[in-house]
UniProtKB/Swiss-Prot annotation:
Gene3D superfamilies noted in UniProt: Rhodopsin 7-helix transmembrane proteins
Keyword entries, A-Z: Cell membrane, Disulfide bond, G-protein coupled receptor, Glycoprotein, Membrane, Phosphoprotein, Receptor, Transducer, Transmembrane, Transmembrane helix
Species this chain originates from: Rattus norvegicus
Positions in the Extracellular compartment: 1-39, 96-112, 175-223, 282-299
Transmembrane portions of the chain: 40-62, 74-95, 113-133, 153-174, 224-244, 261-281, 300-319
PANTHER family per the UniProt record, alphabetical: CHEMERIN-LIKE RECEPTOR 1, CHEMOTACTIC RECEPTOR
SUPFAM superfamilies attached to this UniProt entry: Family A G protein-coupled receptor-like (SSF81321)
Name the UniProt record assigns to this protein: Chemerin-like receptor 1
Entry GO terms, CC: plasma membrane
GO biological process, one term: positive regulation of cold-induced thermogenesis
Length: 372
């Protein structure tokens, strides 16, 4: 998210902001620090974009066309779509950073791109929370879950998630704006005062706007509560309940489920905690050294967006649902290579089918000792 002017009239100066996309403006840092950070952001965001589009795209194809429609595949597809859309719009902001934070895409795209990024953030977080709650219910109430857990209900839940994310992301459509800076650049920022855009500079003396500040606080606190604190509390409570239930009933004979649970919680916490913490501190920016924001926000933002390319690994490929298809996918790739290169030492399709069957049986046996 851009670390840019709070609004167009420099009510709080360019050091005070509440950007709603995933690029950080580094004008507050020194020239060398800013340049290094810009290069760092472009490289990291490009890597995340590539891995995210590839990984989430593969998940969408596999879950949609190669797997039976189940509740889990509904979760996985929606989670992958949210992250995929997030990654699709990253090139716009990568270009923004590469052009030294000169916005050339117009006011409408400033609003739309920021809205979509925020919407996908909320959607991903809510879906992870729903997945955690669904798994918890499956362990605590297996009979009820078996009778009421349906694909139709999963689709309805996803619709609610996307609509709720739309509502929480709507401030981007209202407050995002563009303005020319004193350096001759156009910046995309949050105009919480809703005043007519005017060129601003670092030398402008900050004024007081209680309405704009209250809007800033409302957006930031809402984002922290709904996009982090409440989901983290629910996710942690769900998995702690699962661990307690499995330990008490001795349903798990291996430590793998617990490793997955710990990985999910720690990864989610580490990815988003620094980001939300720094933006909460930004509400009282005068009491915090400028270097904390100029250097900390780029790193925190990069870590946060990295979650979008790690989700396929953490929430899909570590689960049992994709084990069978991973073998089939490998078999298809080998057969394709064999057709292109002619006779080779690769095993035949029949041998791969047999091996796939054996691995599937082993997966079923393992699943009986694990709930994830």
């Amino acid at each position: 998210m851009e670390y840019e002017g709070y609004n167009d009239s420099s009510i709080y100066g360019e050091e005070y902001s509440d950007g709603s996309d995933y690029i950080v403006d580094l004008e507050e840092a020194g020239p060398l620090e800013a340049k290094v950070a810009e290069v760092f952001l472009v490289v990291i965001y490009s890597l995340v974009c590539f891995l995210g589009i590839l990984g989430n795209g593969l998940v969408i194809v596999i879950a949609t066309f190669k797997m039976k429609k189940t509740v889990n595949t509904v979760w996985f597809v929606n989670l992958a779509v949210a992250d995929f859309l997030f990654n699709i719009f990253l090139p716009i902001h990568i270009t923004y950073a590469a052009m030294d934070y000169h916005w050339v895409f117009g006011k409408a795209m400033c609003k739309i791109s920021s809205f979509l990024l925020s919407h996908n953030m909320y959607t991903s977080v809510f879906l992870l929370t729903v997945i955690s709650f669904d798994r918890c219910i499956s362990v605590l109430l297996p009979v009820w879950s078996q009778n009421h857990r349906s694909v139709r209900l999963a689709y309805m839940t996803c619709v609610v998630v996307w609509v709720l994310a739309f509502f929480l992301s709507s401030p981007s459509l209202v407050f995002r704006d563009t303005v020319s800076t004193s350096h001759g650049k156009i910046t995309c920022f949050n105009n919480f005062s809703l005043a007519a855009p005017e060129p601003f500079s670092h030398s402008t003396h900050p004024r007081t706007d209680p309405v704009g500040y209250s809007r800033h606080v409302a957006v930031t606190v809402t984002r922290f509560l709904c996009g982090f604190l409440i989901p983290v509390f629910i996710i942690t409570a769900c998995y702690l309940t699962i661990v307690f239930k499995l330990q008490r009933n001795r349903l798990a004979k291996t430590k793998k489920p617990f490793k997955i649970i710990i990985t999910i919680i720690i990864t989610f916490f580490l990815c988003w905690c620094p980001y939300h913490t720094l933006y909460l501190l930004e509400l009282h920016h005068t009491a915090v050294p400028a270097s904390v924001f100029s250097l900390g926000l780029p790193l925190a933002t990069a870590v946060a967006i990295a979650n979008s390319c790690m989700n396929p690994i953490l929430y899909v490929f570590m689960g049992h649902d994709f084990k069978k298809f991973k073998v089939a996918l490998f078999s298809r790739l080998v057969n394709a290579l064999s057709e292109d290169t002619g006779p080779s030492s690769y095993p035949s399709h029949r041998s791969f089918t047999k091996m796939s069957s054996l691995i599937e049986k082993a997966s079923v046996n393992e699943k009986e000792t694990s709930t994830l």
